[in-house]
Every structure is written in C-alpha cells, then in structure tokens.
C-alpha cells in the first residue's frame, strides 16, 4: 500500500482529494499547521473506511515538515503522491507598492522553500518505487501576476518555475510533476470549481499524466 501526502490539508479540497485517493486504496497523510485540525479530518476519513493520519507542521519550518513526512512514511508506507496546496496567508496578499522586501520572505518560504523541502524528501522514495506524482495546486496569479496580491504572485511564479523544471527532469524516470491552476478560487457556484470536481481532476492528473500545467475551466484542460 502506498500513500498520498496532502500538504495544506483542509476541509474542502484537501478532504475531497483524500477521499478520492482513498477510494483507490491509498493511505492518506494529512499535513497542516494544527494537530487538532488534521486529526479531525483523519477521523472523518477513518469513519468512511479510509486509512488516514494527521501530522502537524508549518511548511515554513523545514525541520518540522521533514519530520511530518518521515513519520507519515513510518506510519502509512511509502509516499507515491505528494500534493502541495497550503493556502496563502492574508498578509502575503498586499498591493505591489505596499509590499516590502521583508514582506516577500513569508510567501517565498511557503511557496518556494516549502515545496523544495517536500520534494527533496519524497524524491528518493519515488525513484525507488519507479513511479509517482508531485502535484502543485495554485491560483491564477501563478500564471498571470496580479499587482493586488504581489507576494503571492512573486512566490507562485517561483513555484511554477520549480515545478516545470521538475516535470522536465523527472519525466524520463516515470515520475510525473503537474500543476493545477484554479482561477477565482474554490467553489463560488461553479461546478468545475467545487472540491469534489477538483479532486477528480487532481486524480486524473495523477492517473493520466501528460503536460505540466492544467487550468480549470479551459477547454483544452
């Protein structure tokens, strides 16, 4: 049995993705900042027959993130799928002319350093398995910079570049790296933006592989 690790797990997309992979027999590692939060999600999944455990870690704390992933592997088995989808903090989303150099540290730590820590941890295991998927979930500012959310735009651009390079480098090894762009956020009355529909799209990216970037709502997606 292998594991899907969801970093930034919440009651919307994270829980829906966990359910979708759980139906395929994956164990689920739920990682977020608050232990009680992920324990509640794990309990919900457990009642539905999904093997799930919660682990507390702030993605801006490299040691804590590595420890959470390490414990998940011990508890649940090797990680085959990594989803990186923490929600940006409100303070990351200031207008560009109000954003200082210091303001960029947090977004970059979350969206560039955090993914690098997680990928570098899981990559040896994926290479040993000879397969696997790394999934980056981002908003529209990862594609088109938005001056109203400068920190996130800068950091998501770095995350996108890192993901694209990983996609190109790891494809020959049978490891797929993909990015799902969700414009306008999750929900909002749009059927293809609902958590369950997005979770299905995420599972399809893992199953079918292909190109790096998919944008929800695009006809070619």
Task: Tell me what each language-model feature is.
Residues 10-11:
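Conserved glycine-rich cofactor-binding loop
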Residues 160-164, 172-221:
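C-terminal helical subdomain
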Residues 25-39:
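Conserved glycine-rich Rossmann-like NAD(P)H-binding loop of the short-chain dehydrogenase/reductase
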């Amino acid at each position: 049995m292998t594991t899907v690790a969801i970093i930034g797990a919440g009651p919307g997309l994270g829980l829906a993705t966990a359910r979708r992979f759980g139906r395929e027999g994956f164990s689920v590692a739920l990682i977020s900042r608050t232990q009680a939060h992920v324990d509640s999600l794990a309990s919900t999944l457990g009642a539905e027959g999904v093997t799930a455990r919660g682990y507390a870690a702030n993605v801006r704390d490299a040691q804590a993130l590595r420890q959470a992933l390490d414990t998940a592997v011990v508890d649940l088995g090797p990680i085959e799928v990594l989803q990186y989808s923490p929600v940006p903090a409100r303070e990351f989303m200031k207008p560009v002319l109000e954003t200082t150099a210091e303001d960029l540290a947090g977004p970059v730590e979350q969206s560039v350093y955090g993914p690098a820590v997680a990928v570098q941890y899981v990559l040896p295991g994926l290479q040993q398995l000879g397969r696997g998927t790394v999934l980056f979930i981002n908003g529209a500012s990862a594609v088109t910079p938005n001056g109203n959310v400068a920190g996130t735009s800068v950091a998501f651009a770095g995350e996108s570049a890192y993901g694209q390079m990983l996609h190109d480098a790891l494809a020959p090894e049978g490891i797929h790296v993909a990015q799902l762009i969700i414009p306008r956020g999750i929900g909002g009355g749009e059927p293809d933006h609902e958590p369950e529909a997005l979770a299905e799209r995420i599972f399809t990216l893992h199953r079918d592989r292909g190109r790096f970037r998919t944008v929800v709502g695009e006809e070619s997606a």
